[in-house]
Amino acid sequence: MAEQIIELEVYLVRHAESVGNVGYGGNAELSVADREDPVLTEKGLRQSELLGQRFKDCPLDCILSSGLRRTLSTVNEVVKAQPENGAKEIEILPSLAETGISHEYSGFTLEELKENYPVKLAEGIETDRMVVSSAGTDDYWNLERANQIWKYIRKRFHSGEKIIVAAHGNFNTSLFLRALNLPPQTGFDVAFTNTSVTKFVFFKKGTGRYGDDIKMLYHNETSHLAQEFPEVTFMT
C-alpha cells in the first residue's frame, strides 16, 4: 500500500449557543444587528470555553471564521487556550456567513471587531464587508459558495496544516456536502450541534487508503460537552 500523504486536516466547527438559537424572549424591537448577528448566551460562552479546552493541546495553524459575532466569540475561546505554537488570531472569511443573512446587514467593520477579538481578514481576501448576504438564494447558490470556500482552502493549505473552519448550522451543511461531493437531495439531514466538531482529512491526490483524496474521520462530535451538558451530546 502506498504511503498516505496528509495535506490538510480540517476541523469544521459550529458556533456555540446564541440568543438566536433559544429565542429573543418576545422582543419585537430587535435591531438588524441583534436579529442577524446575535451574541452568545451564558451557556454558549461556557460551551466555547470547553471547546477551547478540547484544542488546548492541538496547535492549530489557522482559524478561519465567519464574521458574525456568535462564531467569532466561539473561536476566540479556542485562541485563548491555544499552546505557544498554536494560532493566535482569527482570520475572517466573510463567505462563511450563515445562510439567509439579509442584504441590509453587512456586519460590523473589521476595526469594530478588532475591539473585541484578535481578528484580521483572511489572507488573499479584499473586502470591506465582513458578512456575505444570501437572503433569497437557494441551496445551489449556497453549495457553490461552499465549493468556492473549499477551493480557497485547498489552494492555500496543502503542507500538513491543521485548521479550524468555524461557521453555522445551515451553512455547515453546504460545506459538508461539498467536501464529500454529495448532492443537495441526500434524503437525510446533516446535524450540527452547537460547538460540534466534524473532522476531514485531505490527502495528496491518490494517496488515500483506497485511492481517495478525502476522509471524514468523525461528524458532530461533542464529547467536550459531555460532562457539563450531557443533554446536547451524542452520549445521551
What is the meaning of each model-derived region?
Residues 57-59, 153-161:
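Glycine-rich phosphate-binding loop signature in dinucleotide/nucleotide-binding domains
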Residues 168-173, 196:
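GST superfamily/GST-like fold recognition
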Residues 1-9, 98-119, 159-161, 177-236:
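Acidic, low-complexity terminal tails and accessory targeting/binding regions
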Residues 10, 161-170:
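Generic beta-sheet signal
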Residues 5-7, 49-126, 208:
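Phosphate-coordination/substrate-recognition cap region in phosphate-metabolizing enzymes
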Residues 65-66, 144, 166-167:
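Short beta-strand scaffold positions
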Residues 34, 115-141:
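Short glycine/proline- and acidic residue-enriched helix-loop micro-motifs
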Residues 1-61, 76, 80, 84, ...:
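An N-terminal RHG(E/S)-centered segment typical of histidine phosphatases
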